[in-house]
């Protein structure tokens, strides 16, 4: 290829240095020199073309090798990527399955714990209510018995006072000089009996009211205990409620 360019340069120099033909754009060149240079170019071109073709063939071979290598690398990379992806999917499925199993187990444990707490709280509430009912019935029974006793004692005292007053009145009726005093004493005794009966009834009412107040305080304490138990139950159920969060 170097000889071709060299001959072309020499031809260009001959044309530039040739004597011009007057009144035309032509020139006079040495025919022999020009033909010789043309022959040199003709002789050089086939070899240069062969070299160029060899270069092109080598380039095509290199390109084909590079393409084959690239295709092989792409195929290997694709296969490896698919293998990695399949492994990742399998691992993700396994992790997801393990997480779901663990979540189900935790939810089941939380539900069982909540059910146990609810059952315990229900049993405790029933026990407290039963105890409160027994205490209430016992308190009411004691209060009623005490009230009946006080009323009976009051009635007995009242009847006794009335009978004493009547006897005293009958005794004094026969004595004219003390009739007025007997009447006054009888009235006093009757009034005293009524006052004693009223006092006993008041004490009975106060006793019953005090017993009912004690029972009311016991019931309020029981209700507060039940409320605290329900609050603890709701708090525990919210702490272990895995599935909703």
Swiss-Prot record:
UniProt-recorded name of the protein: Uncharacterized protein Mb2952c
Top-level taxon of the source organism: Bacteria
Classification via CDD domains: ATP-synt_Fo_b (cd06503)
Species of the source: Mycobacterium bovis (strain ATCC BAA-935 / AF2122/97)
């Amino acid at each position: 290829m170097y000889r071709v360019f060299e001959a072309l340069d020499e031809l260009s120099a001959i044309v530039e240095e040739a004597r011009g033909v007057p009144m035309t754009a032509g020139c006079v060149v040495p025919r022999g020199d020009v033909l010789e240079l043309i022959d040199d170019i003709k002789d050089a071109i086939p070899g240069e073309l062969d070299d160029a073709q060899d270069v092109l063939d080598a380039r095509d071979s290199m390109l084909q090798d590079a393409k084959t290598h690239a295709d092989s690398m792409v195929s290997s990379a694709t296969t490896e990527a698919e293998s990695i992806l399949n492994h990742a999917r399998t691992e993700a499925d396994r992790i997801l399955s393990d997480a779901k199993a663990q979540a189900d187990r935790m939810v089941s444990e939380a539900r069982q714990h909540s059910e146990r707490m609810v059952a315990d709280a229900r049993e405790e509430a029933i026990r407290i209510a039963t105890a409160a009912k027994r205490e209430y019935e016992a308190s009411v029974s004691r209060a009623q018995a005490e009230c009946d006793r006080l009323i009976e004692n009051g009635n007995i005292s009242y009847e006794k006072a009335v009978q004493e007053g009547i006897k005293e009145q009958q005794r004094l009726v026969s004595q004219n000089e003390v009739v007025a005093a007997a009447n006054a004493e009888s009235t006093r005794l009757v009034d005293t009996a009524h006052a004693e009966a009223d006092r006993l009834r008041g004490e009975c009412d106060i006793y019953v009211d005090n017993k009912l107040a004690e029972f009311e305080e016991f019931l309020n304490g029981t209700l507060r205990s039940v409320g605290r138990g329900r609050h603890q139950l709701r708090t525990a159920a919210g702490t272990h409620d895995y599935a909703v969060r």
